[in-house]
Curated annotation (Swiss-Prot):
It is a multi-pass membrane protein. Keywords: Cell inner membrane, Cell membrane, Membrane, Transmembrane, Transmembrane helix. GO terms for biological process: fumarate metabolic process. The chain crosses the membrane at residues 24-44, 49-69, 94-114. Its main location: membrane. InterPro entries: Fumarate_red_D, SQR/QFR_C/D. This is Fumarate reductase subunit D. It holds the Pfam family Fumarate_red_D. It is found in: Cell inner membrane. GO terms for cellular component: fumarate reductase complex; plasma membrane. It comes from Actinobacillus succinogenes (strain ATCC 55618 / DSM 22257 / CCUG 43843 / 130Z). NCBIfam families: PRK05470.1-1. The lineage of its organism: Bacteria, Pseudomonadati, Pseudomonadota, Gammaproteobacteria, Pasteurellales.
Length: 114
């Protein structure tokens, strides 16, 4: 018999944000460490170029992508990691994903004010 009222899950959109954050972290953070941690202190790259990039609309988009998606990945990992170690927080999904949404809003506001 076919269930005409299937239960919907919020997991697919959350897994999309989680996987995007993991991929961005793996690919972009080594480059950021190279640029901000090595090339900038050695004087190979000027801070003026980085500031100009951050003020451009594309730079703001890059900053948002590099902050929002890894935050979703981290909070998703914490949420599921707590389940793995048998620490069940009441309304854990609401708390952790709510924090991710709050962080997203704060990040958008912060980057928009640059």
């Amino acid at each position: 018999m076919i269930n005409t009222n299937p239960k919907r899950s919020n997991e697919p959109p959350v897994w999309l944000l989680f996987s995007a954050g993991g991929m961005i972290s793996a690919l972009a953070f080594p480059v950021l460490i190279l640029i901000l941690g090595i090339l900038l202190p050695l004087g190979i790259i000027s801070p003026d170029g980085i500031i100009a990039f951050a003020h451009h609309w594309f730079g703001k988009l890059v900053i948002l992508v590099l902050t929002i998606f890894p935050a979703w990945a981290g909070l998703h990992r914490i949420h599921h990691g707590m389940h793995d170690i048998k620490v069940h927080v009441p309304s854990g999904g609401l708390i952790f994903y709510g924090l991710a949404v709050l962080y997203t809003v704060v990040a958008i506001w912060g980057v928009a004010s640059i």
